[in-house]
Amino acid sequence: MSSSFFNPSFAFSSHFDPDGAPLSELSWSSSLAVVAVSFSGIFTVVILMLACLCCKKGGIGFKEFENAEGDEYVADFSEQGSPAAAAQTGPDVYVLPLTEVSLPMAKQPGRSVQLLKSTDLGRHSLLYLKEIGHGWFGKVFLGEVHSGVSGTQVVVKELKVSASVQEQMQFLEEAQPYRALQHSNLLQCLAQCAEVTPYLLVMEFCPLGDLKGYLRSCRVTESMAPDPLTLQRMACEVACGVLHLHRHNYVHSDLALRNCLLTADLTVKVGDYGLSHCKYREDYLVTADQLWVPLRWIAPELVDEVHGNLLVVDQTKSSNVWSLGVTIWELFELGAQPYPQHSDRQVLAYAVREQQLKLPKPQLQLALSDRWYEVMQFCWLQPEQRPTAEEVHLLLSYLCAKGTTELEEEFERRWRSLRPGGSTGLGSGSAAPAAATAASAELTAASSFPLLERFTSDGFHVDSDDVLTVTETSHGLNFEYKWEAGCGAEEYPPSGAASSPGSAARLQELCAPDSSPPGVVPVLSAHSPSVGSEYFIRLEGAVPAAGHDPDCAGCAPSPQAVTDQDNNSEESTVASLAMEPLLGHAPPTEGLWGPCDHHSHRRQGSPCPSRSPSPGTPMLPAEDIDWGVATFCPPFFDDPLGASPSGSPGAQPSPSDEEPEEGKVGLAAQCGHWSSNMSANNNSASRDPESWDPGYVSSFTDSYRDDCSSLEQTPRASPEVGHLLSQEDPRDFLPGLVAVSPGQEPSRPFNLLPLCPAKGLAPAACLITSPWTEGAVGGAENPIVEPKLAQEAEGSAEPQLPLPSVPSPSCEGASLPSEEASAPDILPASPTPAAGSWVTVPEPAPTLESSGSSLGQEAPSSEDEDTTEATSGVFTDLSSDGPHTEKSGIVPALRSLQKQVGTPDSLDSLDIPSSASDGGCEVLSPSAAGPPGGQPRAVDSGYDTENYESPEFVLKEAHESSEPEAFGEPASEGESPGPDPLLSVSLGGLSKKSPYRDSAYFSDLDAESEPTFGPEKHSGIQDSQKEQDLRSPPSPGHQSVQAFPRSAVSSEVLSPPQQSEEPLPEVPRPEPLGAQGPVGVQPVPGPSHSKCFPLTSVPLISEGSGTEPQGPSGQLSGRAQQGQMGNPSTPRSPLCLALPGHPGALEGRPEEDEDTEDSEESDEELRCYSVQEPSEDSEEEPPAVPVVVAESQSARNLRSLLKMPSLLSEAFCDDLERKKKAVSFFDDVTVYLFDQESPTRETGEPFPSTKESLPTFLEGGPSSPSATGLPLRAGHSPDSSAPEPGSRFEWDGDFPLVPGKAALVTELDPADPVLAAPPTPAAPFSRFTVSPTPASRFSITHISDSDAQSVGGPAAGAGGRYTEA
């Protein structure tokens, strides 16, 4: 039994015996016991398990986070999605982002709140730290949100418990936009707790508090105050936040600085915590009805007073814009209360009800401060006239970008480069590897201030070869040019034209050397302002368009670039509007004659000629409509400022080059004139490029095509007639665009064509060209050419462009078409070629006629008037003023240059031209000296902001009036045909500059000033043009003008006696460069054409027969003539320099005689230019402020700007071209000193004084030339090109400009570049640019103006197209 009990089977079998018999009852009882025990054990286990489970569940309820990975979280994850799931599953994951983001307090709260929100953040997550204030709704607390391990500070707005339902709704509605919208400039509402009372709003925390309080605290400690750039950025951010609200149909109920918060990283967020009523009680007027009215910020239309009670309506988008303007004002006043001197009642009465009280301009010194204030004023217009928040934001963004560009790139680099040593940039520049030249060129083109870049380690790339150091002294600005051969000399050996070999080469490369227009002309130009013979240092302007030659970009593209960039800011457009005109010279660097650049041409005399036509052709065709711009851009800039130097030298590389150059020049001149007309809104007379472009464009284009970078070459090669034209081109204001016509022609079409035809300037340029060509073709001694030039300039703004075509026949006396085709080749041989190279002779002749007629008809119109005024003024003044007129004539050329160049600084430059016109700008002084109406008008028209900051405004007026005069005068005055034709070109340049004035301000001025000159001379010129056009082959004057680059120049130079009646005395100003002999720059006293950069083309003429040896270089272009200046009898005629006419052109033509009256007038004017020699002008120029003061005529170069001797033979020029080591400033080179934007900040005031001083120069004999050269440039500052008698930039040595033949070979003899060298004493501008062309832009001011105009309007119209920046 015992065993059975222990046997496992016993329990079951024990009941039965082995036999199956039942066991004893005991076994049954034991079995039941076992079963009972078993069940009880099971139940116990189950119960225990249940108890354990229950206990566990209870624990979870109290410790939910322990179960974070449980089913609940899984469900949450599925509901919230992966991001939320991740956040929930990993409190760690959730916490980590918060922890990482905790550093930027401003943004962290937003993120943390969002994360908290995703995890259903509630009031239980909030930890109140302290109370920070109270509002109408209740209290405001600083709190902290804990999410896992991390915590984020937030602001909690708590609605009082006693709030009514209406207040509850208002409380929640106020936060709606901040909850719905997420933007970097809008305050973020992180959470809303409205399930129970009290209602809570969780807002992101901005540690620096409201912007008003921050600025006020900074004002106490000045060292802590934000810099102007930061304030500008803040203004843009405020506008951006408001714009975002408006885009989503929200309006701000109380927009003011106090309701803008500042994060730890100084980011502005529109929004508030409701503490304004408590913190800034004084900012509100509390009515009897307990209405809190922000009286000083509220728009007048929202407030009304009835029976002494204020009625306030809800805010609108328009009223928000008003408040935005006040907020920006408040920002720049560092939190000052608007109308601080007036009580609330006075503000209500005078500011709100009567709207007689306006906020003054903020005292804070800002870049483009006038433009900023202008935007504020836009915000305070009537509701229907106010801009939208989007428009305001666009304007502010543009200004901000421009300001940033100028301050960072231009201002700092400029200052480093302007330091007494100026070696800072130099070193860095030389350090730049040549291999990186192309890339650096592109970068430079993209940057606002390519030249400055070269000077600084950051951005000077290869262009750092040339460094111009400008030091401001009690006597003005001291310029010291230093050239480093290491950087780009070898890299770009195209044509010694480029100031810096590297830059020139780069430009050349960019320009598609040899066969097609350079595509990246702007880059090279920008970096090496000297394209070919025109090298300019541009410290300010930035390349408007990366695709354009920097110089061109500086010129023609500048406005456009600005527009295109509008703004890429500055660069700016904003690119560098300011600088773009300056860069306009750069295209010449490419070399109008050579695919590479003017350097090549100068160095390779032969390539230049063949290329000259070729580049011109491709360029022109590519930008048929833009052709004028592209063409005129570099040439115009080069010629007007240092056209002669740039153009002549560049154009003079070889006789062959001269021809093409002439053609290019003529074309450029025409183009430039057209552009000028376009820019001058009132110059409707000018026809569109097509009208004057038929054969002309074709020929020009062909020429350009022939010259790889014809446009660039043109600026160099032809007087650069191309420069003049480009400068006059509306785009000329964006000279860079035009200058790089070969590469940019496609991009510039709209600007160039439209502007050229529309503007009087274009006619003026054409005019100038025609008269010049006429003079050149008609005969060196035939005054008819000059009158014709004047007539054309005045009478046919549009015909001007056609004029080139006409001149082709006229110059050659052969069919225009053939001339046009062969003009480049012929030009060297005779004046006709110069014209021929300009345009297809056949079409141009008719075009010229039609141009003349249309010009005559339209000149009175606003646009034409610009051109006409400038042109006629130039001629009229010249003829009337005699010697004075000579200088005056030159001054107009300079003036035209200024017009081209100036946008913002143009005002100064305009004033200076005005002064120059009055005499200050002796070179183009005819308008100033004789009838200052054109120039003064330019100065007067448009307000200072526009003038100072808008290249369009200043240049257009100034250049227009001055340029036409300049062109006319040199032709008239300068005995040598070269100078006179240069004058014509100058006139064209003026027109080109007009485009800068094209801005609203410019247009008016142009219209007014143009009429002064235009009406008188208009008919005569028109008639002459028509006659010449009709007999295009015979018409020397007309043909010369069209082919004027050489023909006209030659004519002028060759016939100094007839042309230089009174001016001749001054003409004799010897200019070492001018004398540089082999070039055969006629020592013709040529009307200090060097003064007139546009005159640069004239050097071409010199090649023709003339008083001075034209054959050598036919480079009467500024440089050649200035070189002639070395020859006592060869006063540089800036205008002549501008026009690179062939010697053949010089030869007197019957047509020229027919136009004798006008021609004589023009001749006198031209003579005036000739008389005024860059050296003298520069030396004598006493313009207040930064005027380049040449110690002597020979010192025309800004101090040491002229490195090369005055006398430069073609061989020497060519040698220089090859070496590219010697840098010379030519007449075409101009230093623009702009007080406003430049470091010296003397833009506005100095300019006027410059004007005054300029007149003195005009009248003054020796210093006159320098003054004339710079006066026109007056706006352009002392550095105007060619401070020395040779008026060569130091680049001259590098570029054949000095020889003039290298670059201007086609235009003039190697000596011609010297003529171009006449240092145009730049008007005292704080900022400066050295550019061979007068069409340089003012980098800062110009950009500013451009930007402002782009933003504000006027500038945008012309030079200010942002284009800029």
UniProtKB/Swiss-Prot annotation:
Alphabetical UniProt keywords: ATP-binding, Cell projection, Cytoplasm, Kinase, Membrane, Nucleotide-binding, Phosphoprotein, Serine/threonine-protein kinase, Transferase, Transmembrane, Transmembrane helix
PTM annotation (Phosphothreonine): residues: 1156
Where in this protein does the record say Phosphoserine is found? Answer: 500, 1035, 1159, 1162, 1175, 1178, 1253
Outline the segment boundaries, as ranges, of region: Disordered: 550-623, 638-698, 791-1186, 1237-1293, 1343-1365
**Some GO term, biological process aspect, for this entry: which one?**
neuron apoptotic process
InterPro entries annotated for this entry?
A: Kinase-like_dom_sf (IPR011009), LMTK1_c (IPR042817), Prot_kinase_dom (IPR000719), Protein_kinase_ATP_BS (IPR017441), Ser-Thr/Tyr_kinase_cat_dom (IPR001245), Tyr_kinase_AS (IPR008266)
UniProt feature, compositional bias: Gly residues:
1354-1365
Example of a GO MF term: ATP binding
Which segments constitute the Protein kinase domain?
Answer: 126-396
Please indicate if the UniProt record lists DNA-binding as a keyword: no
Q: What is this entry's stated membrane topology? A: Single-pass type I membrane protein
What causes induction of this gene? Up-regulated during the apoptotic death of myeloid cells induced by cytokine withdrawal, such as IL3, and during G-CSF-induced terminal differentiation of myeloblasts to granulocytes.
| Record Pfam families | PK_Tyr_Ser-Thr
Biased amino acid composition, Low complexity: 638-655, 675-686, 904-918, 981-993, 1072-1083
What GO CC terms are in its UniProt record?
A: dendrite; endoplasmic reticulum; growth cone; membrane; perinuclear region of cytoplasm
Question: Where are the active-site residues found?
Answer: 254
Give the catalytic activity. L-seryl-[protein] + ATP = O-phospho-L-seryl-[protein] + ADP + H(+); L-threonyl-[protein] + ATP = O-phospho-L-threonyl-[protein] + ADP + H(+)
Which stretches are tagged as biased composition: Basic and acidic residues? 1015-1030
Where do Acidic residues bias regions lie? 1150-1164
Its main subcellular localisation, reduced to a broad class, is: membrane
PTM text: Autophosphorylated. Phosphorylated by CDK5.
Subunit and partners: Interacts with CDK5.
Tell me which family the UniProt entry assigns to this protein: Belongs to the protein kinase superfamily. Tyr protein kinase family.
Function comment: May be involved in neuronal differentiation.
What's the name of the protein?
Serine/threonine-protein kinase LMTK1
Source organism phylogeny: Eukaryota, Metazoa, Chordata, Craniata, Vertebrata
Q: Which gene encodes it?
A: Aatk
